[in-house]
UniProtKB/Swiss-Prot annotation:
One of its GO terms (biological process) is translation. Part of the ribosomal stalk of the 50S ribosomal subunit. The N-terminus interacts with L11 and the large rRNA to form the base of the stalk. The C-terminus forms an elongated spine to which L12 dimers bind in a sequential fashion forming a multimeric L10(L12)X complex. The lineage of its organism: Bacteria, Pseudomonadati, Pseudomonadota, Alphaproteobacteria, Hyphomicrobiales. Keywords: Ribonucleoprotein, Ribosomal protein, RNA-binding, rRNA-binding. Belongs to the universal ribosomal protein uL10 family. Forms part of the ribosomal stalk, playing a central role in the interaction of the ribosome with GTP-bound translation factors. CDD domains: Ribosomal_L10 (cd05797). SUPFAM superfamilies: Ribosomal protein L10-like. This is Large ribosomal subunit protein uL10. HAMAP family: Ribosomal_uL10. It comes from Xanthobacter autotrophicus (strain ATCC BAA-1158 / Py2).
Length: 172
């Protein structure tokens, strides 16, 4: 990499660290290209991104950002996963780590909060933003559905009573 490419990478990473809501740092030593490609595809499918950058360049990009404390984790072959959804990157990383022993989560950050391995795993157990929105819509719609059922129930009961009387009259 020449100097211009390094500056461009640092600028890109700086923008990422300032705009992202969650960052996960992990060791990937020993993973095959196919496994790393699968991780990238899974991250992309969930709305997250994986970057492998030189630790020194990543540390420069982290300076002055909310997640600057993550720089202490950048030792050895590390990758950085990030997403705007606070649950997407941790969830994919934890699921991937369960199936690949060589993928080791070191920690991360959410906003200005530093996360250890347990913190990243705890984030992974939370429902995603889309799941929370769906639950909220369901909770909002539930009272309206109940009201509709309550208002139509007497009419339905009355119709069944009339139907029973009609059958009784036909039988007689």
């Amino acid at each position: 990499m020449d100097r211009a490419q390094k500056q461009e990478l640092v600028t890109t990473l700086t923008d990422v660290f300032k705009s992202t809501s969650v960052v996960v740092v992990a060791h990937y030593s020993g993973l095959t290209v196919a496994q790393l490609s699968r991780l990238r595809r899974q991250m992309k499918a969930s709305g997250a991104t994986v970057k492998v950058a030189k630790n020194r360049l990543a540390k420069i990009a982290l300076e002055g950002s909310d997640v600057a404390h993550v720089s202490s984790l950048l030792k050895g072959p590390t990758l950085i996963a990030y997403s705007s959804d606070p649950v997407a990157a941790p969830k994919v990383a934890v699921d991937f780590a369960k199936t690949n022993d060589k993928f080791v989560i070191l920690g991360g950050a959410m906003g200005t909060t530093a996360l250890n391995v347990d913190g990243v795993k705890a984030l992974a157990t939370l429902p995603s933003l889309d799941e929370l929105r769906a639950k909220l819509v369901g909770l909002i719609q539930a009272p309206a559905t109940k009201i509709a059922q309550v208002t139509t129930a007497p009419a339905a009961k009355l119709a069944r009573v009339f139907g029973a009387y009609a059958k009784q009259d036909e039988a007689a």
